[in-house]
Amino acid sequence: NETLDAVGTGLLDGHITATVYFSGKDPAFALLGDLIAAYEHPEQVFMFLRHGGGDALLRELMAPYGVHYIGGSATGKEAFVSKIPIRRVDDFAGVKLRAPEGMAQDIFERIGAAPVNLPAAEVYTAVERGVVDAADWATYSMNHQLGFHAIARYPIYPGIHSMPVIDISVNAEKWNALPDDLKAILEMGVRDFAGDVTRRLELQDLADVAADRAKGIEVVDWPKAERDRMREIAVEIWQDWAGRSKMARRAYEAQTAFLRAIGLLATE
Protein backbone atom coordinates (compact mmCIF):
# COMPACT_ATOMS: atom_id res chain seq x y z
CA ASN A 1 0.00 0.00 0.00
CA GLU A 2 3.05 2.30 -0.21
CA THR A 3 3.63 2.27 -3.95
CA LEU A 4 1.20 5.11 -4.72
CA ASP A 5 3.33 7.49 -2.66
CA ALA A 6 6.54 5.97 -4.00
CA VAL A 7 5.44 6.55 -7.60
CA GLY A 8 4.17 10.05 -6.85
CA THR A 9 7.47 11.14 -5.27
CA GLY A 10 9.55 9.56 -8.02
CA LEU A 11 11.05 6.83 -5.86
CA LEU A 12 9.48 4.48 -8.40
CA ASP A 13 8.71 5.33 -12.02
CA GLY A 14 5.51 3.28 -11.94
CA HIS A 15 3.64 0.32 -10.53
CA ILE A 16 1.38 -2.57 -11.49
CA THR A 17 -0.68 -3.29 -8.41
CA ALA A 18 -4.13 -3.80 -6.92
CA THR A 19 -5.95 -0.48 -6.72
CA VAL A 20 -7.83 -1.54 -3.59
CA TYR A 21 -4.58 -1.43 -1.58
CA PHE A 22 -4.96 2.35 -1.36
CA SER A 23 -8.44 2.37 0.18
CA GLY A 24 -6.94 3.77 3.39
CA LYS A 25 -6.25 7.00 1.49
CA ASP A 26 -9.76 7.29 0.06
CA PRO A 27 -12.60 4.73 0.16
CA ALA A 28 -13.11 5.43 -3.54
CA PHE A 29 -10.08 3.21 -4.15
CA ALA A 30 -12.08 0.31 -2.69
CA LEU A 31 -15.21 1.05 -4.71
CA LEU A 32 -13.22 1.36 -7.93
CA GLY A 33 -10.59 -1.24 -7.11
CA ASP A 34 -12.70 -4.21 -5.99
CA LEU A 35 -16.45 -3.74 -5.82
CA ILE A 36 -17.22 -6.93 -3.91
CA ALA A 37 -19.87 -9.23 -5.48
CA ALA A 38 -20.44 -6.88 -8.43
CA TYR A 39 -19.13 -8.39 -11.65
CA GLU A 40 -19.27 -11.85 -13.20
CA HIS A 41 -16.40 -11.60 -15.72
CA PRO A 42 -13.35 -9.38 -16.26
CA GLU A 43 -14.72 -8.18 -19.60
CA GLN A 44 -17.48 -6.44 -17.64
CA VAL A 45 -14.83 -4.71 -15.52
CA PHE A 46 -13.03 -3.58 -18.68
CA MET A 47 -16.28 -2.23 -20.12
CA PHE A 48 -16.84 -0.18 -16.97
CA LEU A 49 -13.30 1.15 -16.96
CA ARG A 50 -13.22 2.12 -20.63
CA HIS A 51 -16.84 2.92 -21.38
CA GLY A 52 -18.55 3.45 -18.02
CA GLY A 53 -16.34 6.19 -16.61
CA GLY A 54 -14.01 4.06 -14.50
CA ASP A 55 -10.76 5.05 -16.19
CA ALA A 56 -11.59 8.75 -15.93
CA LEU A 57 -12.46 8.44 -12.23
CA LEU A 58 -9.26 6.55 -11.44
CA ARG A 59 -7.20 9.11 -13.35
CA GLU A 60 -8.82 11.91 -11.35
CA LEU A 61 -8.46 10.00 -8.08
CA MET A 62 -4.73 9.41 -8.52
CA ALA A 63 -3.76 12.82 -9.91
CA PRO A 64 -3.41 14.57 -6.51
CA TYR A 65 -0.78 12.00 -5.55
CA GLY A 66 1.40 12.88 -8.54
CA VAL A 67 0.46 9.65 -10.31
CA HIS A 68 -0.94 9.14 -13.81
CA TYR A 69 -3.20 6.12 -14.20
CA ILE A 70 -2.66 4.64 -17.67
CA GLY A 71 -5.23 1.87 -17.54
CA GLY A 72 -6.49 -1.18 -15.71
CA SER A 73 -6.42 -4.94 -15.87
CA ALA A 74 -7.97 -7.50 -13.53
CA THR A 75 -7.07 -10.74 -11.82
CA GLY A 76 -10.14 -12.50 -13.09
CA LYS A 77 -12.95 -13.63 -10.83
CA GLU A 78 -11.46 -14.99 -7.62
CA ALA A 79 -12.61 -18.42 -6.46
CA PHE A 80 -13.47 -19.21 -2.85
CA VAL A 81 -11.67 -21.75 -0.67
CA SER A 82 -13.97 -23.84 1.52
CA LYS A 83 -13.80 -27.04 3.58
CA ILE A 84 -17.58 -27.22 3.77
CA PRO A 85 -20.22 -27.00 1.03
CA ILE A 86 -21.50 -23.43 0.68
CA ARG A 87 -24.16 -23.55 -2.02
CA ARG A 88 -26.15 -20.40 -1.27
CA VAL A 89 -25.95 -17.15 0.68
CA ASP A 90 -27.62 -18.60 3.78
CA ASP A 91 -24.94 -21.31 4.04
CA PHE A 92 -22.44 -18.65 5.14
CA ALA A 93 -24.25 -18.27 8.47
CA GLY A 94 -21.78 -18.92 11.28
CA VAL A 95 -18.91 -19.88 8.97
CA LYS A 96 -15.55 -18.72 10.28
CA LEU A 97 -13.53 -17.54 7.32
CA ARG A 98 -10.49 -15.54 6.41
CA ALA A 99 -11.16 -12.25 4.61
CA PRO A 100 -9.11 -9.06 4.35
CA GLU A 101 -10.21 -6.03 6.32
CA GLY A 102 -12.46 -3.62 4.49
CA MET A 103 -15.47 -4.06 2.24
CA ALA A 104 -15.06 -7.84 1.94
CA GLN A 105 -15.25 -8.32 5.70
CA ASP A 106 -18.24 -6.00 5.92
CA ILE A 107 -20.17 -8.02 3.33
CA PHE A 108 -19.33 -11.40 4.83
CA GLU A 109 -20.45 -10.13 8.23
CA ARG A 110 -23.70 -8.88 6.70
CA ILE A 111 -24.54 -12.38 5.39
CA GLY A 112 -23.86 -13.95 8.78
CA ALA A 113 -20.30 -15.25 8.46
CA ALA A 114 -17.56 -14.68 11.02
CA PRO A 115 -14.64 -13.18 9.07
CA VAL A 116 -11.17 -12.80 10.55
CA ASN A 117 -8.11 -11.16 9.06
CA LEU A 118 -5.02 -13.37 8.80
CA PRO A 119 -1.60 -12.61 7.30
CA ALA A 120 -1.00 -14.25 3.93
CA ALA A 121 1.62 -16.61 5.33
CA GLU A 122 -0.88 -18.05 7.84
CA VAL A 123 -3.90 -18.68 5.62
CA TYR A 124 -3.04 -22.17 4.38
CA THR A 125 -2.17 -23.44 7.85
CA ALA A 126 -5.32 -21.86 9.31
CA VAL A 127 -7.49 -23.69 6.77
CA GLU A 128 -5.57 -26.94 7.19
CA ARG A 129 -5.88 -26.92 10.99
CA GLY A 130 -9.51 -25.82 11.03
CA VAL A 131 -8.88 -22.40 12.55
CA VAL A 132 -11.11 -21.23 9.69
CA ASP A 133 -13.33 -23.30 7.41
CA ALA A 134 -13.07 -21.04 4.38
CA ALA A 135 -10.95 -18.27 2.90
CA ASP A 136 -11.13 -15.37 0.50
CA TRP A 137 -7.80 -15.88 -1.21
CA ALA A 138 -7.14 -15.79 -4.97
CA THR A 139 -8.08 -17.16 -8.39
CA TYR A 140 -8.91 -20.83 -8.79
CA SER A 141 -5.60 -21.65 -10.47
CA MET A 142 -3.56 -19.89 -7.79
CA ASN A 143 -5.50 -21.65 -5.03
CA HIS A 144 -4.93 -24.93 -6.89
CA GLN A 145 -1.21 -24.27 -7.24
CA LEU A 146 -0.90 -23.56 -3.52
CA GLY A 147 -2.58 -26.86 -2.65
CA PHE A 148 -5.73 -25.44 -1.08
CA HIS A 149 -8.04 -27.90 -2.81
CA ALA A 150 -6.29 -30.86 -1.22
CA ILE A 151 -7.47 -29.62 2.19
CA ALA A 152 -10.60 -27.66 1.23
CA ARG A 153 -12.59 -29.81 -1.17
CA TYR A 154 -15.61 -27.55 -1.77
CA PRO A 155 -14.23 -24.55 -3.70
CA ILE A 156 -16.75 -22.09 -5.13
CA TYR A 157 -16.12 -21.42 -8.82
CA PRO A 158 -16.87 -19.16 -10.57
CA GLY A 159 -16.35 -16.99 -7.53
CA ILE A 160 -19.04 -14.95 -5.85
CA HIS A 161 -17.10 -12.09 -4.30
CA SER A 162 -13.86 -10.49 -5.48
CA MET A 163 -12.37 -9.43 -8.83
CA PRO A 164 -9.67 -6.82 -8.11
CA VAL A 165 -8.70 -4.16 -10.62
CA ILE A 166 -4.97 -4.07 -11.31
CA ASP A 167 -3.86 -0.55 -12.18
CA ILE A 168 -0.89 0.31 -14.35
CA SER A 169 0.26 3.79 -13.38
CA VAL A 170 3.36 5.98 -13.65
CA ASN A 171 4.83 9.11 -12.14
CA ALA A 172 2.87 12.08 -13.54
CA GLU A 173 5.96 14.13 -14.41
CA LYS A 174 7.49 11.19 -16.26
CA TRP A 175 4.22 10.70 -18.13
CA ASN A 176 3.91 14.36 -19.09
CA ALA A 177 7.46 14.32 -20.46
CA LEU A 178 6.65 11.55 -22.94
CA PRO A 179 5.76 12.36 -26.56
CA ASP A 180 2.20 11.64 -27.62
CA ASP A 181 3.13 8.62 -29.73
CA LEU A 182 4.74 6.84 -26.78
CA LYS A 183 1.77 7.68 -24.58
CA ALA A 184 -0.54 6.09 -27.15
CA ILE A 185 1.68 3.01 -27.37
CA LEU A 186 1.60 2.57 -23.60
CA GLU A 187 -2.18 3.02 -23.46
CA MET A 188 -2.75 0.39 -26.13
CA GLY A 189 -0.11 -1.85 -24.57
CA VAL A 190 -1.99 -1.82 -21.27
CA ARG A 191 -5.19 -2.87 -23.03
CA ASP A 192 -3.40 -5.72 -24.76
CA PHE A 193 -1.79 -6.79 -21.48
CA ALA A 194 -5.16 -6.74 -19.70
CA GLY A 195 -6.84 -8.96 -22.26
CA ASP A 196 -3.93 -11.38 -22.47
CA VAL A 197 -3.44 -11.88 -18.74
CA THR A 198 -7.13 -12.41 -17.96
CA ARG A 199 -7.59 -14.89 -20.83
CA ARG A 200 -4.53 -16.86 -19.70
CA LEU A 201 -5.79 -16.95 -16.12
CA GLU A 202 -9.25 -18.09 -17.19
CA LEU A 203 -7.86 -20.92 -19.32
CA GLN A 204 -5.68 -22.10 -16.43
CA ASP A 205 -8.64 -21.85 -14.04
CA LEU A 206 -10.75 -24.06 -16.32
CA ALA A 207 -7.96 -26.62 -16.70
CA ASP A 208 -7.50 -26.84 -12.93
CA VAL A 209 -11.25 -27.09 -12.32
CA ALA A 210 -11.40 -30.07 -14.70
CA ALA A 211 -8.41 -31.71 -13.01
CA ASP A 212 -9.91 -31.25 -9.55
CA ARG A 213 -13.31 -32.59 -10.56
CA ALA A 214 -11.57 -35.69 -11.92
CA LYS A 215 -10.12 -36.19 -8.42
CA GLY A 216 -13.57 -36.08 -6.84
CA ILE A 217 -13.44 -32.51 -5.57
CA GLU A 218 -16.86 -30.85 -5.62
CA VAL A 219 -16.53 -27.51 -7.38
CA VAL A 220 -19.57 -25.55 -6.23
CA ASP A 221 -21.20 -23.31 -8.85
CA TRP A 222 -23.83 -21.00 -7.41
CA PRO A 223 -27.07 -20.55 -9.36
CA LYS A 224 -27.79 -17.13 -10.81
CA ALA A 225 -30.49 -16.42 -8.22
CA GLU A 226 -27.99 -16.76 -5.36
CA ARG A 227 -25.37 -14.66 -7.13
CA ASP A 228 -27.97 -11.96 -7.70
CA ARG A 229 -29.01 -12.14 -4.04
CA MET A 230 -25.39 -11.78 -2.91
CA ARG A 231 -25.03 -8.69 -5.11
CA GLU A 232 -28.22 -7.09 -3.81
CA ILE A 233 -27.03 -7.56 -0.22
CA ALA A 234 -23.63 -6.16 -1.15
CA VAL A 235 -25.26 -2.96 -2.44
CA GLU A 236 -26.07 -2.03 1.17
CA ILE A 237 -22.36 -2.15 2.02
CA TRP A 238 -21.42 -0.25 -1.13
CA GLN A 239 -23.83 2.49 -0.07
CA ASP A 240 -22.17 2.72 3.33
CA TRP A 241 -18.74 3.08 1.74
CA ALA A 242 -20.11 5.63 -0.74
CA GLY A 243 -20.90 7.98 2.13
CA ARG A 244 -17.29 8.18 3.26
CA SER A 245 -15.95 10.65 0.65
CA LYS A 246 -17.07 12.69 -2.35
CA MET A 247 -15.04 10.54 -4.73
CA ALA A 248 -16.47 7.40 -3.14
CA ARG A 249 -19.99 8.68 -3.84
CA ARG A 250 -19.10 9.36 -7.48
CA ALA A 251 -17.49 5.92 -7.80
CA TYR A 252 -20.58 4.26 -6.34
CA GLU A 253 -22.95 6.14 -8.62
CA ALA A 254 -20.92 5.33 -11.73
CA GLN A 255 -20.58 1.65 -10.82
CA THR A 256 -24.24 1.10 -9.96
CA ALA A 257 -25.44 2.94 -13.08
CA PHE A 258 -23.23 0.70 -15.19
CA LEU A 259 -24.33 -2.47 -13.39
CA ARG A 260 -27.95 -1.54 -14.06
CA ALA A 261 -27.13 -0.86 -17.71
CA ILE A 262 -25.69 -4.36 -18.20
CA GLY A 263 -28.45 -6.09 -16.23
CA LEU A 264 -26.53 -7.04 -13.09
CA LEU A 265 -28.63 -4.76 -10.88
CA ALA A 266 -32.35 -4.17 -11.06
CA THR A 267 -33.34 -0.83 -12.54
CA GLU A 268 -34.60 1.75 -10.07
Enumerate the language-model features and the residues they cover:
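N-terminal secretory/targeting leader peptides
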Residues: 1-44, 53-268
